[in-house]
């Protein structure tokens, strides 16, 4: 009986060790992918240049694929008429008429401002399978898109406020 328990514990320790050593290599691969992607965008800067241009929080979201806490972003409940742009490169991304309150804590849109403004990419991070959205001009991480939107498109582009800026429509 003691041998069975010892054997089971040993298997668990080995499995846990494998998982712990595999995790950093997965993160390193994602970091390498992001570095390689930078070179394929119209606006391509070094990480040092992005760090100088963006605040620490903006850099975390846009360049390191971070997420701001829900209900804390300046554009979550913002419904003025205008255009939401990429905070890193100023590319237009979303029109205000596509914005809606999804009650999720982040700004939500039912589509991009025009075809090709946003790139969708498979994201298997954090044990989930999602679709990441990136600015097509600079590759900045915007958030994720889900197929549970309440509008005719059926989509919900869930965007970090830190990844966008807003230009008010002229009256």
Residue ranges and their predicted role:
Residues 42, 51-85, 91-171:
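A short Gly-Trp-Pro
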Residues 1-2, 142:
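Feature for soluble, non-membrane regions of globular proteins
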Residues 32-51:
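N-terminal low-complexity, Pro/Thr/Ser-rich intrinsically disordered segments
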Residues 2-13:
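Positively charged n-region of N-terminal signal peptides that target proteins for export
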Residues 13-21:
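Sec-dependent N-terminal signal peptides
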Residues 24-25:
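C-terminal motif of bacterial Sec signal peptides marking the signal peptidase cleavage site
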Residues 8, 16-17, 34:
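Composition-driven detection of intrinsically disordered, low-complexity segments
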């Amino acid at each position: 009986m003691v041998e069975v328990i010892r054997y089971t514990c040993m298997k668990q320790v080995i499995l846990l060790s494998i998982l712990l050593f595999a995790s950093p290599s997965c993160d390193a691969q994602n970091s390498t992918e992001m570095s390689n992607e930078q070179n394929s965008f119209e606006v391509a800067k070094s990480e040092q240049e992005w760090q100088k241009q963006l605040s620490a929080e903006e850099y975390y979201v846009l360049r390191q694929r971070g997420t701001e806490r829900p209900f804390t972003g300046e554009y979550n409940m913002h419904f003025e008429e205008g255009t939401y742009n990429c905070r890193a490169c100023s590319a237009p991304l979303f029109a205000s008429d596509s914005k809606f309150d999804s009650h999720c804590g982040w700004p939500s849109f039912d589509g991009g401002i025009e075809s090709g403004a946003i790139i969708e990419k498979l994201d298997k991070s954090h044990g989930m399978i999602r679709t990441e959205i990136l600015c097509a001009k600079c590759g900045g991480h915007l958030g994720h898109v889900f197929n549970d939107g309440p509008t005719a498109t059926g989509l919900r582009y869930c965007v970090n406020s830190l990844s966008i800026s807003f230009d008010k429509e002229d009256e």
